[in-house]
Every structure is written in C-alpha cells, then in structure tokens.
A protein has these predicted regions:
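Iron-sulfur cluster-binding electron-transfer modules in prokaryotic oxidoreductases
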Residues: 1-262
Length: 262
C-alpha cells in the first residue's frame, strides 16, 4: 500500500482563506501511514479525500505542528503502556490547543476509536469524528444527491459508546436510498490491532456478516475506522471504506450547484 498524502499535510494549513470557516484536522496515525490496498474501490487515501471534502464545504483546513509525531495514545493504552499513552495524549492536546487558537475552531479526527480516547483525555476543545462533523457542519454547505446503489454501514464500538450510531446511519441515508445495517453484527472483533495477529477473533465476530451481504446484493460498505474496515473487507466479501468517500461521491458544494443552475 502507498500513501501519497504526506506532501499535502507538510504545512500548517491548506488553502488559506481569511473569510472561510476553519477546522483543525488531525489525521490518525493509521491514516497517515497506510495508503490504499491493491484493489481499492477508491482512488485517494482518506487524508486527501477528507481535505477535498472539507474544502468542498468551504472550510480552510489547519493541521497541528509536527503532526507526524502526534498520537492520541490509543495503541499504547491497549498495550498497557499507560504512561506513554498519557504522555502522547498530553502532547496532542497541546498541539491541538495551539492549532485551534485555544479552542476557537473545531477539531476533526478521521478515526472513531482515536476520537473516543481523545474525548476521554481532552475536555477543553470540541472534538469530532467524520460522520458527526459532516452531519453537523457540512450538511447545509453541501447539496446531496441520493444514489440508488445500496450500501452497508458498520457502526463501530466507539461510535456506539459516543452515542453516534444514529448519526452515521442518518448521514448514509442522505447519500443512498437503500442503507443496510446488518443484524447481529456488533463489534467487528478487530480490537485495535489484534485482528492483525489474531484474525480468528475478527472472523468469528463477523461470522453472520457475509451471508447477509451476499443475500442483499450489496457491493460496498462504509464505516469510520480503518482497522475495522480492514477486517470487514476481509470477512464480508465486499470493500469497506470511510463514510467520507460516500459523502464526497454524492455531494456538490452549494456554490457549484448554484453555478450549474445558471
């Protein structure tokens, strides 16, 4: 896999515009380092796609300084290395505080499990994952055109804990006339990075997924956690990618729509 997004985020901001709304975008470690799989259904890494979608909605994208050294600490916490996890969380908080001009602008992280931990350790800023940010801030800045292509949606454990299950489903319904949430499929079993070393956990947790996908005829699924999407892709027979890709496919900026109607 290859990730060509580094050049886009090397600076502190993208497309400076003094009159635009601003958002601080912190791409998760996994989305900074992992590119697209060999047979990906999408053409851009998520970081690139998030930038273009935010700009479509009229936002100036700001990045924290030394972003490639920042981490929310989730991976360290999962290994029991709590001191390192807390230190990384503190470093991230300081960088986001500066980038957001002391909490003036919202913070977006593109991985729901990372955002969940950030909300547990950072209280003085407004933090969002993709589905909630898009639904809250971009919905009125974009023109949605529903596709008749049926799509599957996986609700991550962290989304359920944050009370955002309905948000990602509602967002998907703005994009597609047929949104399918498989029954009896809760936790995907990837469990952070354990799915890489214990794939049987992942396959057992998702044992009821593939039959439902095959029966429905759905060919693509959406979620908001890269590791979950890896396991879902492996065990469903269809690719799963970030919900941001679906939104981008089904939207135009309000400005572009107005121009088209002239």
């Amino acid at each position: 896999m290859q990730n060509d997004s580094a050049a886009l985020v090397a600076g502190s901001s993208v497309a400076r515009n003094s009159t635009a709304d601003k958002v601080v975008y912190f791409p998760s470690c996994i989305n900074q380092t992992m590119g697209l799989p060999k047979h990906s259904p999408v053409e851009q890494p998520l970081v690139n796609k998030m930038i273009s979608l935010l700009q479509k909605g009229g936002y100036e994208v700001i990045f924290p300084k030394e972003m490639d050294k920042l981490c929310c600490g989730t991976i360290w916490e999962s290994k029991g290395m709590l001191d390192i996890a807390d230190r990384k969380a503190a470093e991230l908080e300081a960088a986001l505080w500066e980038a957001s001009e002391q909490g003036k602008y919202p913070i977006l992280c593109d991985q729901s499990p990372c955002l969940h931990r950030m909300r547990e350790t950072i209280q003085k800023m407004k933090l969002y994952e993709p589905a909630e940010f898009i639904y809250t801030f971009l919905r009125d800045k974009l023109v949605f055109t529903q596709t008749d292509r049926p799509v599957a949606v996986h609700i991550t454990c962290s989304m359920r804990r944050m009370g955002l299950a309905d948000t990602i489903v509602s967002l998907a319904k703005l994009c597609s006339t047929h949104v399918f949430v498989p029954e009896e499929v809760g936790c995907c079993g990837f469990a952070g990075d354990r799915g890489f070393t214990y794939p049987e956990l992942n396959s057992y947790a998702l044992r009821k997924l593939r039959p439902q996908i095959e029966a429905s005829g759905i060919t693509i699924g959406y979620s908001n956690s890269r590791t979950c999407e890896i396991g879902l892709t492996t065990n469903s027979g269809i690719p799963y990618v970030s919900i941001a890709y679906l939104v981008d496919q089904c939207t135009k900026s309000v400005k572009a729509e107005a121009t088209d109607n002239l």
